[in-house]
Amino acid sequence: MEVYNDDTEMRSPETQPIKETALEVYNDTAEIRSPETQPIEETALEVYNDTEMVSPETQPIKRRKKKSMVWEHFTIEAVEPNCRRAFCKGCNQSFAYSNGNKVAGTSHLKRHIFKGTCPALIHTHDNDNNPLMSTPYTPKTDTPRRRYRSQNNASPYVAFNQDKCRQEIAKMIIMHDYPLHMVQHPGFVSFVQSIQPHFDAVSFNNVQGDCVATYLAEKQNVMKSLEGIPGRFCLTLDFWTSKLTLGYVFITAHYIDSDWKIQKKLLNVLMESYPEADEALSLAVANCVSEWGLEGKLFNVTFNHPASNSAVENIRPQLCIKNPGILDGQLVIGNCVARTFGSLAKDVLEKGKDVIKNIRDSVKHVKTSESHEERFTELKEQLQVPSEKVLSLDDQTQWNTTYMMLVAASELKEVFSCLDTADPDYKKPPSAEDWRHVEALCTFLKPLFEAVSTLQSTGNPSAVTFFHEVWKTQSDLSRAIAGEDPFVTGIAKTMQEKVDKYWRDCSLVLAMAVVMDPRFKMKLVEFSFSKIFGEDAGKNIKTVDDGIHELFTEYMALPSPQNTTSEGGKADGLSDFDTYIMETTGQNLKSELDQYLDETLLPRVQEFDVLDWWKQNKLKYPTLSKMARDILSIPVSAAAFDYVFDMEPREMDEYKTSLRPETVEALICAREWLLESNASSSAAAQNASATIKSEA
């Protein structure tokens, strides 16, 4: 006997002898029953197709109930004598079923349903509500064989879903910053139609609505994640310009989560029609606070670019009126450290612009001609110059590229000095004076470059990171001003004015962050201020000490489970015990802050995690740890890490300025959130994989 796949015929057992044992082969299950467990007549071999049972004898056929799920969608009708066909209940299309003794299988019927070719099923069923779609379809092999099919290795068919496809297109456009009009591009339409002819093309308005819907859904997730944040929020304001004189304010929240990890989240991108107005930024902050429910939760605001005094003063009331406990709005940083150091670098480059042009022209001569570069390389090898630096032209909108060009050229100055002998086209090598000035420029730019590079390497650097950088820069400038080189002195004086202003505006914030680091506390403040202010150091140290104690007093006054009183006015019934301690020890009980400041400094280990230390000591310092959490969340930079070396404010592209302000905000914010979500998922998957490997 031969048993064929569903698409083949079944031959009568009369043409082939059959053993006395009974064998039943069931389609789709391949169940073999033992003769001991079920007595069967000698010639009783029954082969069950998905449709019926065929007996080897001429006796009346005993029909068996059809088991295949396809019969929920098909009916059998006789079209001619000894010829029956299967008709689809949805589209009424007919398929071969039986012709005489030949019985077709059900594979072609399954394909009609599973492959989604039935017009009646295309738009009315999906994988979740159609039970048939959840049954996987396995293509047949060319070689006839008994079917012992495994359901685990089959790939389930997913029905076409127009709404799901539109959601994915919206996410694609958002994540990859594609233009909304791409859905109407002929190439895109043709591509999609070739993949899924049933997909209905979407218009610009449709995809714009889909993108906004995606943004709103993601916004709900962000809002939910922010509800459980135990501390306060710090806001950074990044201002973008446009060719249409419109301004765009990017507002990002910085905070420390319940696991004591510093986080940030883009909240708003607000268009300002009159960005030069002093109240523009304060209105943007007010809208953000109201929209995200941050009343009473603000701690600090940091500006990306220098703000006018009036603009800063307009922000302060929003911090102190509805946000008690933040020193009457003193914790406002009018200019972030990235822009401050960028402005200093710009001053350096401006002072040396003539020298830099000579160096740039020399580098351009080498890099814009293969023959010139070959001669330069050959000369370098002949002179045995050990430098591994590679020459490159600078991007004048990124000051770090100019610095790296100067460093590379300075190390290769010996080659440039002799290049005119090997390359007759090279006419104007820099002079010895030029090279001396280049070295001076690099001396000023190097500490700025290293400090700003920290913003890229650490992701969310705290104020502790830059306290040392700022006061060290100020000390270096003071020494440079006292020098005798007029070129160096002139640069140092120009830089000194900006550093002094930044220090006046931000020294309190930076110093308070240092105090919250158990490796430094007030000791580093005292040491650095003595270097910077000299005789006036004591007054400035007292300002920081008074500020940190005043802030702690305000935190002690805030309602919390630790210090709430009962109806009788008593905290915990141990006031008499406190009196006893004061009488027996002869001194008042120390506050958490004073106890913390009096303890010995921790060793300065390189991998120290200050947030983790406070997490471990929050029970010892219940109130002080809350204050430390908020102080250490203050960002010193409002610039995105990709743009910390920009010389000018970012500019919104013309395409986005042509869109509605709400659409611009939806596209930019949703992109940020989706990318963060994908990055978190990838990191979690990698951690899980690493854990499995380590356990194995």
From Swiss-Prot:
Residues 129-148 are annotated as: Disordered. GO terms for cellular component: cytosol; nucleus. Changing C91A: Loss of DNA-binding capacity. It is found in: Nucleus. GO terms for molecular function: DNA binding; protein dimerization activity; zinc ion binding. InterPro entries: hAT-like_transposase_RNase-H, HATC_C_dom, RNaseH-like_sf, Znf_BED, ZnF_BED_domain_contain, Znf_C2H2_sf. One of its GO terms (biological process) is post-embryonic development. Pfam families: Dimer_Tnp_hAT, hAT-like_RNase-H. Its main location: nucleus. SMART domains: ZnF_BED. PROSITE patterns: ZF_BED. Keywords: DNA-binding, Metal-binding, Nucleus, Transcription, Transcription regulation, Zinc, Zinc-finger. The gene is HAT. A zinc finger (BED-type) spans 65-132. Residues 129-141 have a biased composition (Polar residues). Transposase-like protein that is essential for plant growth and development. Binds the promoter region of the DNA helicase KU70 and genes involved in chromatin remodeling. May regulate global gene expression by recruiting other cellular factors. This is Zinc finger BED domain-containing protein DAYSLEEPER. Residues 592-674 are annotated as: HATC (Hobo-Ac-Tam3) domain. The keyword DNA-binding applies. Disruption phenotype: Very slow growth and absence of expansion of cotyledons or development of normal leaves or floral organs. Short root with an excess of abnormal root hairs. Extremely rare production of some photosynthetic tissue. It comes from the Eukaryota. Zn(2+) binds at C88, C91, H112, H125. Homodimer.
